[in-house]
Amino acid sequence: MSFSGMVKEELSRQTSTARHCRIAETAALLSACGRITKDGSLRFQTENDAVVRKYFTLLQKTFNIDTEIAIRESSLLKKGNVYHIEITDPLQVQNVLQGTKLSVNEADRGTLFPENGLITQQNCCKRAFIRGAFLASGSISDPEKGYHFEIVCQDEAKAENLRDIIHTFQIDAKIVLRKKSYVVYVKEGAQYSSNEKLSLSSPATEPVLPSVNLPSA
């Protein structure tokens, strides 16, 4: 398992005791991996089993929704599975969208986007949102081999939203366009004006992997 995989596996097992933080993390996961289908269902899709397990747990603990995980083989050349969770009940879909403050972009295949900053007003919720975004589409290198942290976003607006959240911790995150995706990244040697560490771990838990913390000056 890669270093990123180990970090994600560890984070997938941590669930915040605060509902507002669980909502923020759910919003980030759905923003990256979710969409509304033509029939109105809320579909979540990922190739990472740790990510789908975390989303499954968040639905149960935050919205009291019990659903099933569907597993299909990837249709791409690379081997692996694709994991799906689909919510078909209109009331449950509405509750999740209202709770996470996500809007639907009908022009972009029903993808989801955070409407405003209501769910990330507190620092703990900002960390939870970044944690969800990292789980969904992020990677981190082994600090012993050179630090690099990045999260791939589907569009520029999502990348800017995520970058701005990271900036609130006085961390110099930047955006680069790569293969039609927008990547928010933090590199080794970035200068921070704050000694506060951006811990991706849940506040109630100690980070098992020290590298889950972004370095501070």
Where do the PLM segments sit?
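Conserved alpha/beta core segments of nucleic-acid transaction machinery
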Residues: 213-217
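DNA-contacting interfaces and partner/effector-binding or oligomerization modules
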Residues: 46, 53, 57-77, 84-211
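N-terminal, positively charged regions that mediate nucleic acid binding
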Residues: 1-41, 45-55, 59
